[in-house]
Curated annotation (Swiss-Prot):
One of its GO terms (cellular component) is host cell Golgi apparatus. The keyword Phosphoprotein applies. Belongs to the herpesviridae UL51 family. It is found in: Virion tegument; Host cytoplasm; Host Golgi apparatus. Keywords: Host cytoplasm, Host Golgi apparatus, Phosphoprotein, Virion, Virion tegument. It comes from the Viruses. Pfam families: Herpes_UL51. Its main location: virion. This is Tegument protein UL51 homolog.
Length: 249
């Protein structure tokens, strides 16, 4: 009987509940935010604080974007460090060109990430570039980055690379205009005359629009046209902007 009474008394005890602390989840979130701020500050000339990053929801979203760009930038630096250990001329001869191509692509992606992050935090009126930054993050976060799209990002950010500027010969080959006169793109000025004779330089004006530019600007490219040989059977022409006529010489 004594045993049963003890059991009965034990069952009548009130259940006690202990409130679990939510500090563990909060600490994890704060740790991730501090990591993001640290990653972004590596690329910023003027570091930001955690309080500055958490002032608004837009600030938090900007911090997430910046961390994504900073991580991709760090990955590119690690790839460049590994590729720098390659010594040209040793081992497989065909490996040198592949390593050089990967090195150029990694450097371009790293420069693009750094420029996008700097523009996002250091420029004025960054609300206009939200869509552009999202696009840049999607490009750089892809497993196989399309370098043609990176070229568009470079142009929008104002980055210049020597390999982006094609020579006149390569432009003639890409457009299929070998040993023939090139017709220039007409602009608004109709008083200028463009000499399209072979052996002369041709000026082409292109209108460039970018979300980062307050207004469109023109880019001028000079193309050298090769001389025409008799076998080409392509007569020289001269284009005049006054009457919009093409006449054979």
């Amino acid at each position: 009987m004594q045993t049963s009474s003890r059991t009965y008394d034990y069952r009548r005890l009130k259940a006690e509940y202990k409130q679990l602390s939510a500090s563990s989840s909060t600490d994890k979130a704060m740790h991730r935010l501090r990591e993001a701020v640290h990653a972004v500050n590596i690329l910023l000339p003027t570091p930001i604080t955690l309080e500055m990053a958490l002032l608004s929801a837009d600030g938090v979203r900007k911090l997430v974007r910046g961390q994504s760009l900073a991580r991709t930038y760090s990955a590119c630096l690690r790839n460049l460090e590994c590729l720098s250990r390659h010594v040209p001329g040793r081992g497989n001869p065909g490996l040198d060109a592949v390593v050089e191509t990967h090195r150029e692509n990694a450097q371009r992606v790293a420069d693009t990430c750094a420029a996008a992050l700097l523009h996002m935090y250091m420029s004025i009126g960054t609300g206009r570039t939200d869509a552009f930054v999202e696009h840049a993050i999607q490009l750089t976060a892809a497993t196989e980055t399309a370098m043609s799209d990176i070229a568009l990002v470079e142009r929008a950010l104002g980055l210049t690379h020597p390999h982006n500027e094609r020579s006149p010969a390569s432009m003639d080959e890409s457009t299929g205009m070998k040993n023939c006169a090139v017709l220039s793109h007409m602009n608004d000025n109709k008083d200028d005359a463009v000499n399209m004779e072979p052996g002369y330089n041709t000026t082409i004006d292109r209108l460039i629009s970018s979300p980062l530019l307050s207004q469109s600007k023109r880019e001028r490219t000079i193309i050298s046209t090769p001389a025409v040989t008799p076998k080409d059977n392509c007569p020289p022409v001269k284009f005049s902007r006054e009457n919009n006529l093409i006449t054979e010489l």
